[in-house]
Amino acid sequence: MAREPQRIRRRERKNITAGVAHVNASFNNTMITITDAQGNAIAWSSAGMMGFKGSRKSTPYAAQVAAEDAGKKAAEHGVRTLEVEVKGPGSGRESALRALQAVGFHITSIRDVTPIPHNGVRPSKRRRV
């Protein structure tokens, strides 16, 4: 039985000039997703996708590399201006933002959308190292 040759799907070039960069900086990783105004993903990247493993994923440099990668992918689709939404307490927040500026995007606004509980669930026990 001969296998049929698989069709390679080429990524369609969307022509979007303005987008929203969602930077999710947790203690363990940094994820960057660039979407259009409606929230449809255009490009994404994370520190883990860039080859960083373990505790190196949470470094500012890993966030910078991931943001540059997501920015280059989004620039191929014609994105020039970005609104940035930053979420989470991680160390890659500012470095991801600077990397997006360095790629050449015009950043119109920066919003912190970190969810803050109004005394929600009980936190986990303290770490003893």
Curated annotation (Swiss-Prot):
Record keywords, A-Z: Ribonucleoprotein, Ribosomal protein, RNA-binding, rRNA-binding
Subunit structure: Part of the 30S ribosomal subunit. Interacts with proteins S7 and S18. Binds to IF-3.
InterPro entries in the cross-refs: Ribosomal_uS11, Ribosomal_uS11_bac-type, Ribosomal_uS11_CS, Ribosomal_uS11_sf
GO CC annotation: ribonucleoprotein complex; ribosome
NCBIfam families assigned to the protein according to its UniProt record, in alphabetical order: PRK05309.1, uS11_bact
Family designation: Belongs to the universal ribosomal protein uS11 family.
UniProt GO MF annotations: rRNA binding; structural constituent of ribosome
One Pfam family from the record: Ribosomal_S11
Naturally occurring in which organism (per UniProt): Rhizorhabdus wittichii (strain DSM 6014 / CCUG 31198 / JCM 15750 / NBRC 105917 / EY 4224 / RW1) (Sphingomonas wittichii)
PROSITE patterns recorded: RIBOSOMAL_S11
Main function: Located on the platform of the 30S subunit, it bridges several disparate RNA helices of the 16S rRNA. Forms part of the Shine-Dalgarno cleft in the 70S ribosome.
PANTHER family (alphabetical): 40S RIBOSOMAL PROTEIN S14/30S RIBOSOMAL PROTEIN S11 (PTHR11759)
Protein name: Small ribosomal subunit protein uS11
GO annotation, biological process: translation
